[in-house]
Amino acid sequence: MTALAAVVALGASLAGCGSSGEETTQRYSWPLATASPEDTVTQIFAEKFAEEISELSDGRMKIQVYANSTLGGDRDLLETCADGDIPFVVQNTAPQVSFMGDLAVFDLPCVFDSLDECREKIDNPEFYELISNVYTEGGYHLLGMADQGFRVMSTNKPVYSFSDFKGQKIRTMENSYHLAFWKAIGANPTPMSFSEVYIGLQQHTIDAQENPYEVIVSNNLYEQQDYVVETNHLPHLISLIVNDDFFKDLPEDEQEIMTEAAKIATEYAREQSDARIADKIATIEESGTKILTLDDQTRAEIRKASKSVYESIEENIDPAIYNAYMDGIE
């Protein structure tokens, strides 16, 4: 029996446990899967949700968290969640774009000047409802959205002005909008498996890469880099989703417990993310790697150069979602 089959069987059997006596309280246990290692904000988000579910239900409802791709990688988890085999999944939004194209709104570069501004937008009722509808149409129910801060650039070539991006060989994810962004600002983006990044930096087949601070430190990428540039080009968003049919079939009181647990877990994950980012920055600075920030002029030049990326995304997603995301952005 595969790990997934065993988990599905366990969840089904526990859902029916209990004696036939009228006073017996029905108890449930469901799996939640992530593709992330245990010491990450993604896992913190998942574990806090599970903790709150148990607390708010007085132990009647349980969530068993499976980390580190135990039940499959990001794509596998999305598919099994849509099928209902794994009710709950916590993962970043990037791999979800191929399933729900409107989520490409989160690939719009350099929209926000601060994480507070970004979180305010995510929590905006109008925008959140629009994004929730995207998940519903995909077969999911969005319970919450936390983050790992912004994605930043680490490199062996300093970036003090816009022209310093020119020619930098930077590893990116296999994402057409990400590739278009780095090309637009003059860099030479190269899609590469993440497992190859450290060696690529070590052997100088690439100059740079981009990721949240947590990834840069946990994978020791900073050891091979002289600089980290706070490009803050994209927020690294983490979604907590549940199979939509599964959620709708739950009694109203259990839906309310899940909604409240997700709200608490989202705020907790954000707080933990902020604290961990500060810790990761300290680790990088102590190593001798320099952290560079971009001035307003350079950020303005990046936005101007990225116009074609904005236009491409705008053409390919729901106009209402694009407009709601960009509302209030200069």
Model-found features: residue ranges?
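C-terminal motif of bacterial Sec signal peptides marking the signal peptidase cleavage site
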Residues: 12-16
